[in-house]
Design a protein with these regions (language model features):
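Transmembrane beta-barrel wall of Gram-negative outer-membrane proteins
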Residues: 1-36, 61-72, 76
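Structural signature of Gram-negative outer-membrane beta-barrels, strongest in the C-terminal barrel
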Residues: 15-17, 124, 143-155, 162, ...
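Short loop/turn motifs that connect adjacent beta-strands in outer-membrane beta-barrel proteins
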Residues: 19, 78-80, 138-145, 216-219, ...
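Surface-exposed loop/turn segments flanking beta-strands in extracellular/periplasmic regions
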Residues: 40-53, 104-113, 160-197, 237, ...
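Face-selective signature of the C-terminal outer-membrane beta-barrel domain
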Residues: 69-92, 115-236
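Membrane-embedded beta-barrel scaffold of Gram-negative outer-membrane proteins
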Residues: 74-76, 80-88, 92-100, 265, ...
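Conserved C-terminal beta-signal and adjacent last beta-strands/turns
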Residues: 122, 146, 303, 391-509
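Gram-negative outer-membrane beta-barrel transporters
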Residues: 218-219, 324-326, 344-431, 505-506
Length: 509
């Protein structure tokens, strides 16, 4: 299976004066790769076949062109105020041409996987403009760090979807298939396609926001702020092979989302903190429902509190935090109509505890570690079972990464890193209140993945140029694991096998 990828990301900075700087960042990516839907579930787990097995037609590809550019201007108005203007534009054009897993035909033990043919060209454009005023001043004995900003945005998306829906599985030879246990047993057809969706969407977004971080005392800090969002979304459904006429739906909504936080330092190495935030986000322009209607915005509330501790003069830092997050209208793949369409869940809740530690143990020796216990469940819904665990969310997960750079001698600048990432078992799909509306549940096993890296860094390798060379190794033990599922038994994504990626970074100053 061959993948082609080109990625460029140039960045330029210009000090126009002692008070004004301009920064330009660009990004271009070309990607052409087979459409890999991973493996399939059998029984309560994933099929016992190699993760390298490709269950589709490798000659069918997803071809993507993506470009993004950002221009940011900073201007120091005075010693207390700074102005920022940023404009970002992005365009993505893709062609999705697949013969991919659809469903198992007959007994699962036979391994006959029906394949569906799809053609989906898509174009997405987004343009955003931000203007912000940053402040750093005092009122009496109270210090303030403030931000006031306004954001304008527009997103446009258009997509046409055609497919054969897997063909006629009741007639041998009338549908494409592959045997998951023996991929030499297969039949790839090129059937006539039916256009089942042709839609374009436009989102217009206006946001205004403010924030103030107030130092009431040297050991007492308060933050408060908020954001007001107004958006207008229009979807136009063009004629397809099921609908002969066009239709248009429009949705306008607004919300104010506050945030507040407090941090108190009873003793120098210890900080107690608590935060409350609300969120409001229009659904992306590319989201599609089976009936062509628009989705309500995603809304959320989050509570967090914990303790931070610093040791050895701040060289080692750790945090323990409790959190409780609730979100409404979270989109997921439609279990009744296929993953090209979405449905919104009523409410999902995630609560748990996080622990992390980071710092320098000895000169040149750094460590980062974290652990999280996350209980993510559906709490309110008409389709999915209330109280059921959300897919792809493990109760336990954590990571450890440590690096060492030699500080002197002929090996100065050389370094190495080693670490691990672990996840517990996860559900593959949502459970439905009525089992007839969802596929049978299954689990993805927990795993531990080992990673490593080699480094070389040198200051002033050329005039005013620093160098960082790295080789990163992922899954060095080539362990079999699964990164997630897409709410279907036939789409279980495999984790990457042993991979080595080299990089060179030059930093000009």
């Amino acid at each position: 299976v061959k993948t082609e990828r080109i990625f460029l990301a140039p960045t330029f900075g210009w000090e126009m004066s002692s008070r004004t700087t301009l920064r330009f960042e660009a990004e271009y990516m070309y990607d052409r790769a087979p459409i890999d839907r991973g493996l399939v579930a059998i029984g309560n787990g994933v099929a016992p076949i190699p993760v390298s097995r490709f269950l589709g037609d490798p000659s069918r590809k997803l071809e993507t062109h993506h470009g993004k550019a950002t221009i940011t201007l900073w201007h120091d108005i005075s010693n207390m105020f700074r102005w920022r203007t940023a404009f970002r534009t992005a365009v993505t054009s893709s062609r999705y041409s697949s013969l991919e897993s659809n469903f198992l035909v007959g007994a699962e033990s036979d391994g006959i996987l029906n394949l569906a043919r799809y053609e989906i060209p898509t174009t997405v454009q987004s343009h955003y403009l931000q203007n912000e005023l940053h402040g750093n001043f005092t009122t009496g004995s109270i210090k303030h760090k403030t931000i006031i900003g306004i954001e304008l945005g527009r997103e446009n998306s258009s997509a046409t979807a055609s497919g054969d829906f897997g063909g006629d599985t009741s007639t041998p030879g009338a549908f494409s298939y592959i045997n998951i246990f023996n991929t030499n047993d297969r039949l790839f057809l090129n059937p006539a396609l039916t256009k089942f969706s042709d839609a374009s969407t436009q989102n217009n977004i206006l946001g205004a926001y403010f924030g103030d971080q107030v130092d009431l005392l040297d050991n007492l800090h308060v933050h408060f702020g908020g954001r007001f969002d107004l958006f207008d979304q229009t979807i136009t459904n063009h004629p397809d092979d099921f609908t002969a006429t066009s239709s248009q739906n429009n949705k306008t909504d607004s919300a104010f989302s506050p945030s507040v936080g407090v941090a108190y330092q009873p003793w120098k190495p210890i900080t107690l903190f608590a935060n409350y935030t609300e969120s409001f986000a229009p659904q992306s322009a590319g989201s599609r429902s089976i009936n062509g209607n628009l989705f309500n915005p995603e809304r959320g509330k989050s509570y967090e509190g914990g303790i931070k501790y610093q040791a050895f003069g701040g060289r080692l830092r750790s945090t323990v935090a409790l959190f409780d997050t609730r979100k409404k209208n979270v989109l997921t793949a439609d279990p009744l109509n296929g993953f090209f369409f979405s449905v919104a869940t009523g409410e999902q809740r995630s609560k748990g505890v996080e622990f992390d530690i980071a710092g320098q143990i000895l000169p040149g020796w750094d460590i980062i570690a974290n652990y999280a216990y996350i209980d993510a469940r559906v709490t309110k819904d008409l389709l999915f079972a209330e109280g059921s665990r959300a897919p792809n969310s493990a109760l336990h997960q954590g990571s450890l990464w440590t690096t060492y750079f030699f500080q002197e001698g002929v090996v100065q600048g050389f370094g190495a890193g080693i670490g691990m990432y672990a996840q517990g078992k996860r559900n593959g799909i949502f459970q439905c209140q009525d089992p007839a509306n969802c596929q049978a549940p299954f689990e993805m096993a927990g795993y531990v993945r080992m990673d490593a890296a080699l480094y070389y860094r040198k200051q002033e390798v050329f005039n005013k140029t620093n160098l960082l060379a790295a080789i990163n190794f992922t899954n060095v033990l080539d362990h079999r694991y699964f990164s997630g599922a897409q709410n279907f038994r036939e789409i279980v994504y495999t984790g990457a096998p042993f991979t080595a990626i080299g990089s060179l970074k030059f930093e000009f100053h």
